[in-house]
Design a protein with these regions (language model features):
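Structure-specific nucleic-acid interaction/processing domains
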Residues: 2-111
Length: 111
């Protein structure tokens, strides 16, 4: 990748719009689930999987099953995304409510 394309890629990354939403990580082997929220739910899996592969994930409850069953037994699901024009002041509270709702539905742990 030449210098100009790299600069363009970095600029595009910095200018992308947030995608606020709720996601789940599910272990196929045990049926365990973890639910979290993100301001970039569309790219959240990359960061999670990176930390889990290295063994440096801040989520110990997720790291242990990952180590026991391996990456192939896990899946990432985007459960819900807030619309782009959702009011900024109530966004955090709404994400917490929706996370709690999905945790109850899936009988999941918090991320």
């Amino acid at each position: 990748m030449d210098r100009q394309s790299r600069k363009a890629a970095i600029a595009a990354y910095k200018e992308r719009k947030p995608a606020y939403g709720v996601f789940a990580v599910i272990c196929n082997a045990t049926g365990e689930a973890w639910v979290g929220v993100s301001s970039h739910v569309d790219t959240e899996q990359n960061g999670l999987w990176f930390g889990l592969r290295l063994g440096t994930s801040p989520f110990a409850a997720l790291q242990a099953p990952w180590k026991a069953h391996g990456e192939a037994e896990f899946r990432f699901e985007e459960l819900e995304r807030l619309r782009e024009d959702f009011p900024q002041l109530s966004r955090g509270d709404e994400l917490k409510k929706r996370q709690a709702l999905w945790r109850a539905r899936l009988q999941a742990s918090n991320l």
